[in-house]
Amino acid sequence: PVPLLYHKQVRCQNNFCAVRFLYRAANSAILKFIREWKENAGNFRPAEDESMDKIIIRPMTPEDWGAVSRIYVEGIATEYATFQTECPPYTAWDASHTKECRLVILSGGVLAGWCALHRVDPRWCYRGVAEVSIYVGEQFRGHGLGFQLLSALCAAAEKAGYWTLQSTVLQDNAASRALHAKCGFRLVGHRERIARDCHGHWLDTYLMERR
């Protein structure tokens, strides 16, 4: 017969091998996790930061005017977004734009841009034609917010019964021409030396249209 001590030795050796296997497996998994964590550390953010990237498009309200006017002033300062030289008071702006299709876009809870329409002609036959105004805050430009905002405006305008949207783009505003083209606008006119800027320089404009 095999000595009892031998059975105990074999059992201990088997247990040791099992423990050593589990230790190595666990150690390997831990090392792999640490290695992957180091490689991807730059991609991790606290959960609360996720809200900072949240984009919301909603109707504009009178309470938004402070942020809207501030962004408008930033656009005026570029000297290629508009011929306007100063931001009008809210009452004047409100009277010159349609009540519908006024939208703002928020990024991380901050108002980042706005858009609106104004009629090009008061006559009934042109009731479905409107001019686009769209501005994105300086710190939010170049992140695709303008495309999201203009796309939403086009959808809202179509739902409201407008059949043609047009936009007058100054000659140096290549980014605006590209944005409108991306949203389905096409170039229908080039007006040479049509207006003078605040420095007295003659400027061309491009008329873009979406139907």
Task: Locate the predicted segments by residue.
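A short beta-loop-alpha structural element at the N-terminal edge
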Residues: 55-68
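Conserved acetyl-CoA-binding loop-helix of GNAT-fold acetyltransferases
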Residues: 142-155, 178-182
